[in-house]
């Protein structure tokens, strides 16, 4: 919702927005704007218009405010840095980018996967440690499968799924059922 507001638990999100804005603006020299609950409705409307026209803004940095009810069909590329495991929310985020628009034959989505640790370190975990990871891993696998299923480059998603399943000793059947059981130490 464009009117979504922050709570005190969202200070990490605010820091992340600030960091991404700083990196894109200062390190990459891009013209970016934040689209958050801190901007008033008039400012948000101006940001959407400038981005849609393509005459100034190269990127919009947002958390929550672009989830539902915001229409910016000109978005061609999205970097989803902090994705949700809520299917409705990630389908809306994907749909936000995939909307048809003039001179937009396709869109590119970079969806960053969040795992509890690097895959090459999983082999050193105890069974109990790996079990604690599995809820997040399971949710990320489901999201990767959903995004990959409809993408033009599904082989990348399939390779990542295979790497994750191999690291955590998750079979295809367990992955499909969602009933993951970690192998032996």
Which sequence ranges carry the predicted segments?
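Conserved strand-helix element at the start of the C-terminal RecA-like helicase core
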Residues: 1-21
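A conserved mid-domain beta-alpha-beta active-site/ligand-binding segment of alpha/beta enzyme cores
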Residues: 156, 164-167
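Glycine-centered helix-coil hinge/cap
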Residues: 16, 25, 133-136
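Conserved RecA-like P-loop NTPase helicase motor core
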Residues: 31-158
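Short helix-loop-beta junction
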Residues: 22-30
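Short, flexible helical or helix-coil boundary motifs
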Residues: 151, 168-171
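The feature captures the C-terminal accessory region of ATP-dependent helicases
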Residues: 173-185
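Short coil/loop linkers at secondary-structure junctions
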Residues: 30-31, 171
